């Protein structure tokens, strides 16, 4: 069997959720969209269901997968519904739905529903993706109330730059939110992972932790709370070939790395088809049999090369950690000029092995 695999530490997941819930985030919906950022949505939901206040996914297909697996906790559709006929399924399965557009509001007004909805009414305070315009917000709230088809409304927005701790954008967005929700009697939800960790003075009845659940920092700098996160995924494989190369020899496609001295090279069963970032450069950290080392040359579809020169005991079958508890996913992502969200979500054919502790 090919040795590439992702080890998922469910106890670390629970620890990270509890950190989100405790740190001024109010109740917390665990965000498990995109297959729980590559960690496996059903297994993550099963691990958290007894602890979590609910879950959030992107769309009804992801929510239905959870219900089919027996998950009965509240599930919020972060992008709401895409077609009006989804409302019947939302009611049938007790999903909560975001409303971010006037057409969705009109669909609710026109729908014949078996029971009332829980709606999270989204205002665009500066992200400028989806959300009602601020001047529409109060009227939309009142329209939902008078339909008689909505049992509960939560007021929500989303911060564009909460991961930038020196930016005033989050405070500016909060000021817009406060101005246009004035007089509306409802709970609020504003905080994603960076807002939970980095903006404690901004209130929120509900938080929506995502990347922090999986143990990756949303910040590009050290942060005391983010430093308490525990990595959930360890991506690992093994050495399948060893080469002794003299100075002047090149490694991999494009000969982008040339040995400046005699080097001992290990070939690892891991490549960009598995989800390891192709653009990770020479020098990206790895760990081999517990010792730090580095990536060499270009990442191939199924293989990559590492430096064994400083790890003389390593050889065929040696364990290689690509990211996890000793090699931070955030550092690998930074070297590859991307973000942890992307490298987690890109994992495709690597089997996941779950542990409870």
Swiss-Prot record:
Keywords: Isomerase, Pyridoxal phosphate. One of its GO terms (cellular component) is cytosol. Its EC number is 5.1.1.1. Pfam families: Ala_racemase_C, Ala_racemase_N. Substrate binds at residues 129, 301. It catalyses: L-alanine = D-alanine. InterPro entries: Ala_racemase, Ala_racemase/Decarboxylase_C, Ala_racemase_C, Ala_racemase_N, Ala_racemase_pyridoxalP-BS, PLP-binding_barrel. The active site is at residues 33, 253. PANTHER family: ALANINE RACEMASE (PTHR30511), ALANINE RACEMASE, CATABOLIC-RELATED (PTHR30511:SF0). Catalyzes the interconversion of L-alanine and D-alanine. May also act on other amino acids. NCBIfam families: alr. This is Alanine racemase.
